[in-house]
Each structure stands twice: as structure tokens, then as C-alpha cells.
Design a protein with these regions (language model features):
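Pre-Walker A (pre-P-loop) alpha-helix and adjacent loop at the N terminus of AAA/AAA+ ATPase modules
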Residues: 1-41
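Conserved alpha-helical scaffold flanking the Walker A/P-loop in AAA+ ATPase domains
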Residues: 22-25, 80-102
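Walker A/P-loop
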Residues: 24-65
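Conserved beta-strand position immediately N-terminal to the Walker
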Residues: 33, 101, 139
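P-loop (Walker A) phosphate-binding loop of NTP-binding proteins
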Residues: 38, 72, 144
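Conserved NTP-binding/hydrolysis module of P-loop NTPases
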Residues: 68-84
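Canonical AAA+ ATPase core
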Residues: 79-84, 109-113, 121-177
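Walker B catalytic acidic pair
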Residues: 104-105, 116
Length: 177
């Protein structure tokens, strides 16, 4: 139940009650969410703890300036069948083939790589070498983003922001928390 998950998360995350509530709404409505906040506010811990409490497969993708689309979606490799010695392509799935994806610092990678991730979010599949590969169900992307004014960021275009149903602002806990 949502209350059980919320209480599990509150054991790990101090404060951030509104953030926990909004993330749970995103998950239970089967939508993606973008968490915006400076580093060090437990965004990553929240998402990994959420996956654990829901018993879903979880992968973290650290978005960096040199990350390539195939690092996310997977790639085809040439495979030699030992019995026939015939060469063929074999698909190796990338980390996006998981139930909950933490797209960490999504605005630190160039637009081409962002687009590969965001297309998968929209279509819930990956197209490689002319073949479609369905993503698991359920499939959620919870992305983190540093504020745009920070150096070394690539702002997400409006069309890509539309892939996220929720933009959740993560701030420092107040004194009481």
C-alpha cells in the first residue's frame, strides 16, 4: 500500500515529506517525474529506496558529457554461433531495461543522448537495428536535474520536458526536520 511505502521511505529520508508524496503520486499514476535540486539532498537515496520498498528492478544511469545513446539503450554486437560458426547480430540490452530508472543529472549530457532516453520514455520501447524491444512493465523514469544556472548543464528542451508528468522541486529540509 502507499502508506506502507511512505513509512518505509520516511525511515531512510529525513524530512522531504512533500517530495515523497509527489514521487509516490507519480509512481502510482504510472508517470515519469523530474526531481530538481542541488546535489546532496538525498534524491538518489530516495529513488533507490523507493525501488527497494516496491520490490522492483532498479538501475541508475549517471548522465555525463561523454555518455552515448547506446550506453543507455543497449547495442548490437556481432556474435559467432559456436555450433554453426555463423555470425549474426545479438542485442545486448542497456540499463534502461529495468522497472525504475534513475536518470541521474539528466541535464549533464548532450541533447542527442537526452533524446534517446526521452524517446524510450515516450514509446516504452527501444529501437535498435530496425527491431523494437519493449521495456518492462511497469516502467518509470525518475530523473534528477541540477538547477539550470549550474555550470556544465544542457537544459532540457520544452518538448522533452513534456515527457515528465511531474517536476518536483527538492529543497533543503527546514529546521524542524
Amino acid at each position: 500500500s502507499a502508506e506502507r511505502v511512505k513509512s518505509e521511505l520516511k525511515k531512510v529520508i529525513i524530512g522531504q515529506d512533500d517530495v515523497i508524496e509527489q514521487v509516490l503520486i507519480a509512481i502510482f499514476t504510472r508517470n515519469h517525474a523530474l526531481l530538481v535540486g542541488v546535489p546532496g539532498l538525498a534524491k538518489t537515496l530516495l529513488i533507490s529506496s523507493l525501488a527497494e520498498s516496491l520490490d522492483l528492478e532498479y538501475k541508475r544511469i549517471q548522465f555525463t558529457p561523454d555518455l552515448m545513446p547506446s550506453d543507455i539503450t543497449g547495442t548490437e554486437v556481432i556474435y559467432s554461433d559456436p555450433s554453426t560458426n555463423e555470425r549474426q547480430f545479438k542485442f545486448l540490452p542497456g540499463p534502461i531495461f529495468s522497472n525504475i530508472i534513475l536518470a541521474d543529472e539528466i541535464n549533464r549530457t548532450p541533447p542527442k543522448t537526452q533524446a534517446a532516453m526521452l524517446e524510450s520514455m515516450q514509446e516504452r520501447k527501444v529501437s535498435i537495428g530496425g527491431e523494437d524491444h519493449s521495456l518492462p512493465d511497469p516502467f518509470f523514469v525518475l530523473a534528477t536535474q541540477n538547477p539550470i544556472e549550474q555550470e556544465g548543464t544542457y537544459p532540457l528542451p520544452e518538448a522533452q520536458l513534456d515527457r515528465f508528468m511531474f517536476m518536483i522541486k527538492v529543497d533543503y529540509p527546514n529546521e524542524e526536520e
